[in-house]
């Protein structure tokens, strides 16, 4: 006979230690009881009383734990493998089927008897392991040391083990075995039983407490069997409710929780805390309260940081310490700062208007002059004292300025957009302190330099044109919308220059965006090159410096509001064009100086020739050799040549070698051809070519003034190769024709 299923056997075998000994004792007691019932063949089945019971019954079954006779008349008989009824505790061979009709089978109750015997044996074994407690009706499970619950996953595993052991065929185990199994599956659980007084009774049966035990003494059994009833299924073993309580909070967590609850306001406590649970109902596993930290709560930032004042930059203070106490006005008492409670509110929103007047800072326009800023603003207690003192100081300065500047009126500041006007007062010649007052708008620096008076400039340097405006992409120039000025100055409000004069001294405050002219580079045709509002009519050198974009269309708005049309030829950059910033891209390894290179070198020659020649010992001396003729193109001093060539950052020995190769006069000067060839050799060295031992005649012919031997009509060096091919083709055709005519 199988007493347990394989799953329950595995669960029991997994237990070790003291729990394993209890399981072995329970198993032996259950096997002995079943063997005793299986061997006896009785007509009227009787259950022998337990060792501690002196009372038995021949008419029915007796509960060995409670000592009561159980009524089994309404129970169905157990069927065998062949469909026969079996007596309770008997076999098919020893029982007559005819006599079973009057009796009642007790096969369904056999496992209960075995479980009761196993529970009693386990209780005796348990008493030897754990000493009983001082309470009379205390359960031995309550004497167990309290265990902590590891987590929610252990709680679920405990419930699974309970449902497995108490359902279906798994209900053979006793209460102690179930508890031991739970301990094996969940070693960190805290298990307790309800007291007997809290157990509910049913309609047909009741849980029997230890006081109703027939022994009359104190019964430490934790298991009481129901007498029967419709509410309990016949295949289940009903045990007292087991409550698994979660682990208590640690001391540190309790301290943090108590501290947070004490510091919270009553309104917050009413929201966060919940009413105490009802103790009248069944005890259920309660989730431990979450420990709220100051960082996680919504109101904790304001409550914990209430003593922190709002940050502000202290305003500068004028040197009032130099003034006497009589000159200072009485400053009213400033309102105190807001209390910290105004910032710590969970229900009210945090409003920026709660700042006091001490946090109000002064505008930048009121503090423009650097003279108003002083040191020692720490003397003021708050910002209101500083602001009031700042107003007094400004009023005194205004009064002093008005006394000194009575001769200046607002009518002197007259603005004109196109022309510069000068006004002189008709006064006598004896009055030398007559003021010349005028205002100029859109003036150039050349005009300002022609003003016959002392000029004082105030303001920053003119803004240079940034690279993103100087070098715009071709797509931006082609597809930009009409009227789009980008990040540059607005056309409607052009920058102006104002001049204030007094006593023959002019004060110039300029905000003009001046475009500086670069050397040896053409004017780029970008959007900011020739704006009409940036050019002045009375400026004499405006067209010479900036030039005029005559090919481009007028910039007045047209009828179409779409994309602006511009000529592609003016905006696109051709790859074949020479880039002065990157000359190596247009370099071709040829054995002579090209026409383009010769023109660039001649520009350097013209701008630096015939300079510092008086440093030569023979230049102003009348006894110099007449054989030294000065050419028409002029000469260049060797010191000037060295200065120009040194800008290439080539080694000095390389430059000396180049100078020796091109020097033909041997008198400390170079002529035009020598200078141009020397510049070409410097560029060849920068391109990575080695210096030749001797210069080819073709190089000297290419830099000659008339260029006789070098065909420089076509700039493309591949032109000669193509012409040769054409000549060869023509010659081949002529040869073929001659051969045909000769054959004919």
UniProtKB/Swiss-Prot annotation:
Protein's GO biological process: lipid metabolic process
Acidic residues bias located where?
Answer: 400-412, 537-546
Source taxon at top rank: Eukaryota
Recorded hits in CDD domains, A to Z, give:
EH
In this chain, the stretch annotated as Disordered covers: 1-61, 76-98, 187-237, 260-282, 302-350, 366-412, 522-574
Keyword Lipid metabolism assigned to the entry: answer is yes
Q: Which InterPro entries match?
A: EF-hand-dom_pair, EH_dom
Example GO CC term: the record gives:
cytoplasm
Q: Which UniProt keywords apply?
A: Lipid metabolism
Q: Where is the composition biased (Polar residues)?
A: 198-211, 260-273, 378-390
SMART domains to which the protein is assigned, alphabetical: EH
EH domain span: 617-706
Signal sequence coordinates: none
* Comp. bias regions, Basic residues: 556-572
Q: What is the documented function of this protein?
A: Positive regulator of phosphatidylinositol 4,5-bisphosphate turnover and negatively regulates signaling through the cell integrity pathway. Involved in rDNA silencing.
UniProt similarity note: Belongs to the IRS4 family.
Full protein name: Increased rDNA silencing protein 4
Gene that this sequence comes from: IRS4
């Amino acid at each position: 006979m199988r007493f347990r299923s394989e799953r329950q056997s595995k669960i029991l075998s997994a237990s070790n230690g003291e729990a394993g000994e209890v399981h072995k004792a329970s198993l032996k007691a259950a096997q002995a009881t079943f063997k005793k019932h299986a061997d006896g063949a009785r007509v009227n089945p009787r259950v022998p009383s337990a060792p501690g019971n002196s009372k038995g019954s021949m008419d029915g079954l007796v509960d060995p734990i409670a000592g009561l006779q159980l009524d089994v008349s309404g129970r169905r008989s157990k069927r065998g493998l062949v469909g026969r009824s079996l007596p309770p505790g008997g076999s098919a061979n020893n029982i007559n089927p005819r006599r079973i009709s009057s009796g009642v089978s007790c096969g369904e109750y056999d496992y209960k008897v075995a479980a009761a015997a196993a529970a009693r044996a386990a209780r005796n074994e348990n008493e030897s392991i754990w000493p009983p407690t001082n309470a009379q009706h205390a359960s031995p499970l309550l004497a167990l040391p309290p265990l902590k619950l590891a987590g929610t996953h252990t709680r679920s595993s405990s419930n699974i083990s309970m449902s497995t052991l108490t359902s279906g065929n798994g209900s053979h185990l006793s209460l102690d075995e179930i508890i031991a199994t739970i301990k094996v599956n969940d070693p960190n659980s805290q298990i307790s039983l309800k007291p007997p007084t809290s157990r509910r009774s049913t309609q047909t049966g009741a849980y029997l407490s230890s006081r109703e035990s027939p022994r009359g003494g104190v019964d430490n059994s934790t298991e009481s069997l129901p007498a029967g009833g419709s509410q309990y299924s016949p295949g289940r073993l009903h045990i007292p409710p087991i409550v698994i309580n979660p682990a208590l909070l640690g001391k540190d967590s309790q301290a943090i929780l108590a501290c947070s609850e004490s510091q919270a306001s009553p309104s917050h406590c009413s929201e966060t805390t919940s009413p105490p649970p009802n103790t009248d109902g069944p005890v259920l596993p309660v989730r431990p309260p979450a420990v709220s930290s100051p960082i996680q709560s919504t109101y904790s930032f304001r409550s914990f940081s209430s003593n922190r004042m709002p940050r502000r930059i202290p305003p500068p203070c004028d040197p009032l310490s130099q003034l006497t106490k009589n000159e200072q006005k009485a400053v009213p008492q400033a309102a105190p700062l807001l209390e910290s409670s105004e910032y710590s509110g969970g229900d009210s929103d945090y409003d920026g208007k709660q700042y006091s007047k001490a946090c109000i800072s002064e505008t930048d326009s009121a503090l423009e002059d650097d003279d108003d800023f002083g040191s020692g603003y720490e003397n003021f207690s708050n910002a209101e004292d500083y602001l009031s003192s700042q107003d007094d100081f400004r009023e005194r300065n205004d009064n002093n300025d008005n006394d000194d500047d009575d001769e200046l009126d607002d009518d002197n500041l007259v603005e004109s957009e196109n022309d510069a006007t000068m006004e002189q007062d008709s006064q006598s010649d004896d009055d030398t302190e007559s003021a010349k007052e005028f205002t100029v708008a859109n003036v150039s620096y050349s005009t300002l330099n022609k003003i016959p008076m002392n000029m004082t400039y105030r303001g920053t340097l003119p803004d240079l044109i940034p690279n993103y405006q100087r070098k715009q992409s071709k797509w931006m120039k082609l597809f930009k919308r009409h009227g789009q000025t980008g990040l540059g100055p607005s056309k409607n409000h052009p920058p102006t220059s104002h001049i204030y004069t007094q006593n023959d001294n002019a004060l110039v405050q300029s905000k003009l965006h001046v475009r500086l002219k670069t050397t040896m580079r053409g004017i780029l045709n970008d959007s900011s090159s020739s704006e009409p509002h940036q050019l002045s009519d009375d400026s004499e050198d405006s067209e010479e410096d900036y030039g005029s974009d005559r090919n481009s269309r007028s910039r007045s708005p047209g009828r179409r509001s779409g994309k602006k049309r511009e000529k592609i030829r003016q905006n696109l950059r051709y790859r074949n064009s020479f880039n002065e910033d990157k000359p190596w891209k247009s370099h071709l390894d040829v054995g002579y100086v090209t026409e383009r290179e010769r023109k660039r070198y001649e520009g350097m020659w013209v701008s630096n020739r015939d300079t510092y020649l008086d440093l030569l010992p023979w230049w102003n001396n009348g006894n110099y050799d007449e054989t030294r003729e000065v050419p028409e193109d002029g000469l260049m001093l060797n010191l000037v040549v060295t200065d120009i060539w040194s800008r290439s950052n080539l080694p000095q020995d390389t430059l000396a070698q180049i100078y020796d190769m091109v020097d033909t006069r041997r008198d400390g000067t170079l002529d035009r051809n020598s200078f141009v060839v020397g510049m070409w050799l410097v560029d060849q060295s920068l391109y990575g070519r080695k210096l030749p031992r001797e210069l080819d005649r073709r190089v000297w012919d290419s830099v000659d003034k008339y260029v006789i031997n070098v065909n420089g009509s076509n700039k493309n060096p591949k032109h000669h190769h193509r012409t040769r091919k054409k000549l060869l083709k023509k010659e081949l055709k002529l040869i073929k024709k001659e051969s045909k005519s000769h054959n004919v």
